[in-house]
Regions:
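Conserved Walker A/P-loop ATP-binding site and its immediately adjacent core
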Residues: 38, 42-85, 183-185, 260-261
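Inter-Walker segment of RecA-like/P-loop motor cores
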Residues: 73-128, 296-308
Length: 401
């Protein structure tokens, strides 16, 4: 794979401000843009340009988050008809609903729409409609956001990822976006990627920093660990940090636990009421059922929540599963991040070189003094990796902005 380094000028915070970037990347063809850091505005660069653009994302949360930031910009979110609960539901979609969604997209294109937001599994419908409407495919650019997820999701969505990969070949212009540099060694083994050029952004050292991750090797249960965290925040004793000699205290905790079963167990054991907690997970029938059972057991209603928008009220505790590991934007000015990993439990296994960087990158506000901080709870005794090797891998892979 050929790699080209593009130096980002000093003072550039978002790449949409980097006016000379378009002179350094292709105007057509397939290529990879390794942005190196999260939160640098890569998708905004493409959504804000004059080109016809299809943003393909692996997660609905990411797409809705982006769509809600551009309500006045005439974007089309495929399969969204104004009913948010319906959009996030992971139940089966009837043939009549599919026809309606396709007709809505068809009308959007007929009326001159140029910005389409889709999940990976909708690329086939999008391509079909563009062809039906005699659109010049050369004029459309597909932006595959967080494309590393194509590989991670293969073990449970192999058909979806393969069909996405096949349909992408029907588009002459495709940009693969990622902040995950380690992918190179794997991409070189794949015919589809090995002949592409990877354009890698090189940021000035003063513009990036390594997150401050407090790594705690522990054999305690998730519930026991959460008990200490919940108690601290309820008593106004959240994490603190000093900035220019002034002490700041966190009043909100974001807890990344990729198991709704464990989240429910924590809420039940620690008597966390709905007013205190936001649960962000995939809207599957199984997860909905677990929250209904929790509601029945405690006598209060718990349901799947939303990512708060800019200016929205944040609850003291937010539990997140992997559905928001990538691409989602949180706008808290004081939230601190906690990450739980356990190699003995498949759902709690994380890739330290990818997932942690993505998770920490979810906090977007520079005014949050805890933006680049996190505590990682892990248990290397349950894996073949030593604690020293774990820490070295983590420190090598992390970079934030």
């Amino acid at each position: 794979m050929k790699k080209t380094t593009i130096k980002v000028p000093l003072g550039i915070k978002y790449i949409s401000e980097f006016k000379d970037l378009y002179n350094n990347i292709p105007t057509n063809g397939h290529y990879i843009l390794n942005k190196k850091v999260c939160g640098c505005g890569a998708t905004e660069l493409y959504l804000g340009c004059d080109k016809k653009c299809i943003l393909a994302s692996p997660r609905k949360n990411l797409l809705y988050n982006k769509y809600s930031q551009h309500l006045s910009d005439n974007f089309h979110l495929f399969r969204y008809n104004g009913d948010k609960d319906k959009y996030f539901s992971n139940g089966s979609i009837s043939s009549s609903e599919t026809v309606t969604y396709k007709e809505n997209l068809r009308d959007y294109i007929k009326n001159g729409g140029t910005k389409i937001l889709i999940t990976y599994d909708s690329i086939r419908h999008t391509h079909e409609i563009l062809q039906d409407e005699k659109q010049d495919i050369e004029e459309w650019e597909v932006i595959v956001d967080e494309f590393q997820v194509m590989f991670y999701d293969c073990h449970f969505k192999a058909t979806t990822e393969y069909e996405f990969y096949k349909h992408l070949q029907s588009f002459p212009n495709v940009v693969f976006l990622s902040a995950t540099p380690f992918l190179e060694e794997y991409l070189d083994q794949l015919d589809f990627f090995k002949n592409m050029t990877m354009y890698e952004l090189e940021w000035p050292r003063t513009m990036v920093e390594k997150p401050k991750v407090n790594m705690t090797n522990t054999s305690k249960t998730i519930t026991k660990l959460c008990e200490g965290i919940i108690d601290k925040y309820r008593n106004g004793k959240g994490e603190t940090t000093l900035v220019d000699g002034k002490e700041y205290r966190s009043k909100e905790a974001i807890l990344y636990i990729n198991s709704v079963k464990d989240i429910v167990k924590v809420i039940k054991a620690l008597n966390i009421n709905p007013e205190e907690v936001n649960i962000i997970c995939s809207s599957t029938p199984e997860n909905i059922s677990k929250l209904k059972e929790l509601s029945k057991a405690i006598g209060m209603e718990y349901k799947i929540g939303d990512i708060p928008g800019k200016g929205d009220t944040h609850k003291m505790f937010t539990f997140c599963t992997s559905t928001v590991y990538v691409g989602a934007d949180f706008y808290s000015d004081n939230a601190y991040t906690y990450i739980f990993a356990n190699p003995k439990v498949e759902s709690l296994t994380i890739d330290v070189s990818v997932d942690i960087q993505q998770i920490i990158g979810r906090q977007r506000l520079d005014s949050n003094p805890f933006k680049n901080m996190a505590t990682l709870y892990f248990n290397t005794k349950a894996s073949d990796m030593t604690e020293e090797a774990f820490k070295k891998t983590l420190e090598t892979g992390l970079m934030t902005y």
